[in-house]
Design a protein with these regions (language model features):
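Short, small/acidic-rich helices and loops at N termini and domain boundaries
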Residues: 1-29
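Conserved inter-motif catalytic segment of the P-loop NTP-binding fold
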Residues: 69, 98-191
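Intrinsically disordered, low-complexity segments used for protein-protein interactions
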Residues: 6-9, 13-14, 35-36, 46, ...
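The Walker A/P-loop phosphate-binding site
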Residues: 22-124, 129, 139, 169
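Generic detector of low-complexity/intrinsically disordered segments
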Residues: 10, 16, 24, 35, ...
């Protein structure tokens, strides 16, 4: 048992040194990571996570949909957004939301009028409260920006990351958990 404790103690003291991702000033991006040992972690009590869309999405979660083009990722993510923002449901998958949440849907490839058409088609089948949807659903489209706006959201730019975090902060209120949907990631990062 003594060897076991010594082994854990030595792990706790090991520094984390990434092999890449150096900042411009030469320091590692991840040099100050918080590390939890099981002996500490097992004692912690975490707050119960709130379902935002039952059986699918909870607060403090990240979800990524991945599949080839043309299989319906936008339809699916838009349905999730509408259920969350408009207190809707999809009985087939047992998805529902009893408390409307603010949603920012950022689209990198579709025209706003195409999304409008999809939303109009989805509203009746999802039982969305349209008044809540009007209040809680924000949509940002890359291709619907005016020509004068050359600087669309690009997640590899630090200022744009801060802008997105500001939206989250501005839309966080008691019992609300802002949801950001990025559709699709490859169009929102300059490669």
């Amino acid at each position: 048992m003594e060897n076991h404790r010594g082994f854990l103690g030595s792990i706790h003291r090991l520094p984390f040194v990434p092999k890449r991702n150096l900042r411009k000033d030469g320091n590692h991006l991840l040099e100050h990571l918080y590390v939890s040992l099981w002996r500490d972690m097992e004692k912690r009590r975490y707050p119960k996570r709130k379902p935002l869309v039952s059986n699918l999405l909870h607060d403090r979660e990240a979800v990524m949909l991945y599949s080839p083009t043309g299989v319906g990722k936008t339809w699916l993510s838009l349905s999730i957004a509408l259920i969350a923002a408009g207190r809707g449901s999809l009985d087939l998958l047992d998805w529902r939301n009893d408390e409307a949440q603010p949603v920012c849907y950022v689209d990198g490839e579709m025209l706003e009028e195409d999304i409008q058409e999809r939303i109009r088609l989805l509203i009746p089948s999802l039982g969305v409260d349209e008044n809540l949807l009007r209040k809680n659903f924000s949509f940002v489209s890359r291709v619907s920006q005016p020509d004068s706006n050359e600087d669309f959201l690009s997640l590899d730019m630090e200022q744009h990351q801060w802008d997105l975090l500001k939206w989250i902060r501005d839309n966080t209120r008691k019992n609300s958990h802002p949801i950001v949907i990025l559709d699709n990631l490859s169009n929102l990062v300059e490669l």
